[in-house]
Amino acid sequence: MKLNKDHVSAPKFNILFFIIVFCVLLSSLFATNSSFGQDNLRKAEKSFRDWSVFVSKDDPEMCFIASQSIKGEAFRNNQKLSSVNREKGTLYIIKILSKDSEHEGTFYAGYPLQVGSKAILEIDNKEKIVFFAHPSPKAKAEKDHAWAQKYDQKKLVDYLKKGSKAVMSAISHRNTVTKDTFMLTGFSDALSELEKRCKAN
């Protein structure tokens, strides 16, 4: 099992997007009350099956929907590993308030990604969206996150609305390939709720 690691130009990261990601990087695990547990985040405003809506406590204009992987697998040298030291993968869609109806997708891997590598999100074994790890990471949030390109954002949201399951394949700094499975039940409802709750003043 191999992942394409060809070098590509780095995506341009939205400042607001990075701030929100930084707010949630300390933990990707959902608690039983659907809260990320950070001081600057509220509990989930509302949950729709596999997806939950979050709003920043300090800035209500910062908000996103998120879902944690229901299954994680790891491979090295084409052999499946029985266990790896990592947190669960999390997929985010973040509302960009400075741009009407625009969103940004990001993936929290739960481990340091290979620098500049690609992570491939495949929806229903048909559609694919490429996420990119940071080409020169320094902060922790730059090491364990991957971002979709701006030109793929609308396509990503459309695919997730129509799909039932998505699998993210990524590669770690130790050349371990991971596959995280996300269910898409409730995605459209969560996105609609996000639009209602997260509006610029």
Feature names for model-found ranges:
Residues 1-14:
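N-terminal secretory signal peptides that target proteins for export/translocation
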Residues 9, 27-28, 35:
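Serine residues within intrinsically disordered or low-complexity segments
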Residues 13, 31-32:
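Low-complexity, intrinsically disordered segments with a bias for serine/threonine
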Residues 16-17, 114:
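Hydrophobic alpha-helical segments and their boundary regions
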Residues 18-31:
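Bacterial N-terminal signal peptides
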Residues 36-201:
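A generic "folded-domain core" signal
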